[in-house]
Amino acid sequence: MSDRKQALEMALRQIEKQFGKGSIMRLGENTDQQVSVIPSGSIALDVALGAGGYPRGRVIEVYGPESSGKTTVALHAIAEVQKRGGQAAFVDAEHALDPKYAKNLGVNIDELLLSQPDTGEQALEIAEALVRSGAVDILVVDSVAALVPKAEIEGEMGDSHVGLQARLMSQALRKLSGATNKSKTIVIFINQIREKIGIMFGNPETTPGGRALKFYSSVRLEVRRAETLKQGQDMVGNRTKIKIVKNKIAPPFKTAEVDIMYGEGISREGELIDIGADLDIVQKSGAWYSFNEERLGQGRENAKQYMKENPAIAAEVEQQIRDHYGLNGEKTVTVEGEDDEVLSLLDDE
C-alpha cells in the first residue's frame, strides 16, 4: 500500500473513531438508501405518495387554506403510528386541538403527548428535545404560522419584526434535520397560506416561516377543499384534494382526492368506492355499484353507507386494493439517487 493510501486509511479510521461509524464513506457504498415508511391513514394518499406512506426520519410540510383539512391529515398519521405501538407528540402552537375530534379519528388521546407553548422558541426547543430523545415516532407542529418569536410577543402591538420568524425556523431546522434522521422520527409541520403583495403574474400564494422549511422538507402536501358534500340540505363534509408538490422518495405532483366528513375525518368507505371503481374491483354500472355481483347501492353515497354497515365487504375490498398497490402496513423502500432535491414550481419563488 502506498504512503498516500495508508495516510488516507489512517485519516478515515481517525474520523470514524471521533465522529462514529458512517460519518464518512465512499459514495459507491451507499448509493441506495433504505427508508422505512408508515401509512398515512388514507389509502388514496398512500398511493399518491408512491412509497406507501410517510418516510421515517424526514421532515414533512402540510399546508393549505384555512379549514381545508391539514390538521385532520396529521391526526390520521398520528392514529396510524399509535396503532403500531408508536409514541406520538403534538405541539399545539395554535392552542386549538379538539381532543374529541382527535379521538373520533382513532387517536389514543390518553397516550398522546401534548404541548401548548407560549412562544415559537419554546415550541421548537420542545420539538427538538422530543426528537433527540429517540423515543418519539411522530411529532406534529401545528402550525408554523403560530410560532411567534418571543421578541414579538414581548414587544408592542404594531412593532416591526421583519424576518424574525424566518430566522427562527431556519435555525430550528438546521438543528432538527440531523436529529430527525438519526432518531427516525416523522416530523410534520402544518402551515398556512399567505398572499404576496404586488404580484401581477404567477402564483401570489406563499407559506409563512421563510424558505428553510421548503428546502428541508422531504415531502410537501398541499391540502385544498374541492367541494362541499351534502346530504339533502345538510352539509356533511368536504371533498378534499391533497397534492404532493414535493417528494424526495418517489415521483411528485400526484393528487389524492378524499372525503373529509365533519366529526369523522377521512372517509375510508369513500376511498374504497373511488379506488375500487378505478381498479374495477368495485363494478360500476350506470349509477349502481356492486362487488362480486353483490349490489352495494345506487349512487356513491348509498354505496358508502352499505360498506359502512357491512365491514366484512369493506375489509375485502380494502385488502384487494392494498394487494394491488403493495400497501400492506409499514414497509421499507429503497430511495435511489437522492441527489439534490425534487422541487415543485412552488419552490422556485
Swiss-Prot record:
GO biological process, one term: DNA recombination
Record key words, sorted: ATP-binding, Cytoplasm, DNA damage, DNA recombination, DNA repair, DNA-binding, Nucleotide-binding, SOS response
Residues reported to bind ATP: 64-71
Gene3D superfamilies xref list: P-loop containing nucleotide triphosphate hydrolases
Any one GO molecular-function label of the UniProt entry: ATP-dependent DNA damage sensor activity
Main location: cytoplasm
One term under GO cellular component: cytosol
Entry's transmembrane regions: none
Subcellular location: Cytoplasm
Superkingdom of origin: Bacteria
Function recorded in the entry: Can catalyze the hydrolysis of ATP in the presence of single-stranded DNA, the ATP-dependent uptake of single-stranded DNA by duplex DNA, and the ATP-dependent hybridization of homologous single-stranded DNAs. It interacts with LexA causing its activation and leading to its autocatalytic cleavage.
Protein name stated in the entry: Protein RecA
Organism whose genome encodes this protein: Exiguobacterium sp. (strain ATCC BAA-1283 / AT1b)
Gene behind the chain: recA
